[in-house]
């Protein structure tokens, strides 16, 4: 049973290859991180879990957002809204931002795109020679 959601696994590829991304069933793959927390609340997941920062627990004090350099709220806005706009709508919206907000948007979007490209290989299955 997998734990990857749309933001982590589906777009950013933020999982361990041949690790937590290798599962038979991925029930929450189409949910954004915020939706996973909402489902958890409905299911009665303890608040101590729902309010703790997302972490792969790779080292003491590690959090996903610190490691990524961008919040999951931004990733959700970027993948769940911005990338679904057509090019003209994207450009119009970006031009509506003041200089400070545009710089922040560009910085966070660049991080998302960089992580997405860097981890794209994780979204492909292993190569096979097909010699038999």
Language model regions located:
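ATP/NTP-dependent adenylation/nucleotidyl-transfer catalytic domains that generate, transfer
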Residues: 1-132
């Amino acid at each position: 049973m997998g734990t990857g959601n749309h933001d982590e696994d589906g777009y950013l590829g933020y999982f361990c290859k041949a690790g937590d991304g290798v599962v038979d069933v991925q029930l929450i793959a189409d949910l954004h991180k915020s939706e996973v927390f909402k489902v958890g609340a409905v299911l009665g997941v303890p608040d101590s879990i729902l309010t703790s920062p997302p972490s792969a627990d790779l080292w003491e004090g590690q959090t996903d957002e610190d490691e990524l350099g961008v919040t999951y709220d931004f990733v959700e806005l970027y993948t769940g809204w911005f990338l679904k706009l057509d090019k003209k709508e994207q450009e119009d919206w970006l031009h509506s931002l003041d200089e400070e907000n545009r710089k922040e948007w560009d910085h966070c979007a660049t991080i998302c795109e960089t992580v997405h490209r860097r981890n794209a290989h994780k979204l492909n299955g292993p190569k096979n020679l097909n010699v038999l």
